[in-house]
Amino acid sequence: MAILKGRFIGETLYSEGLRMQEIAHRSVSEGNPDQVILLEHPNVYTLGRRGDHQDILVGPDVIQKLKLEIFETDRGGEVTYHGPGQLVAYPIIDLRRLNQGPIEFVRKLETLTTSLLSTYNILSLIHI
């Protein structure tokens, strides 16, 4: 039976959440149980490898008013917004132990999330 350790952190700066993920990744890589980190971030836009500052569709006045942080990351993707009230889950899981690839795992997470939201009468869609 697989063990998954979960931690709810609360509101955390994106950089600190990233540091927590790196620590969790090292632990899981050493054979320790998989982890999921649940937290919220203050207003932040993350720019992934395919992102560009031009993809941020709010002006400097809004960025200043909302105290938006812009954080460049080496992760995939383009631009993502995170903010207060948005629960973010970071699964740190050794997929080899589950005999799954990343695409299959992400599809299962999407299905799980859609199912969970439907129990709260929240409609969600998966775009492939």
Regions found by a protein language model. Give the residues of each.
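Short alpha-helical functional segments enriched in proximate histidine and acidic residues
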Residues: 24, 115-123
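DPxDG-like acidic metal-binding loop motif
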Residues: 84-97
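Structural motif
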Residues: 35-37, 69, 86-87
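Generic structural signal for residues in well-ordered beta-strands
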Residues: 3-6, 70, 124
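Short, His- and charge-rich active-site/binding loops that engage polyanionic ligands
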Residues: 41-42, 47-80
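N-terminal, positively charged, Ser/Thr/Ala/Gly-biased leader segments
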Residues: 1-47
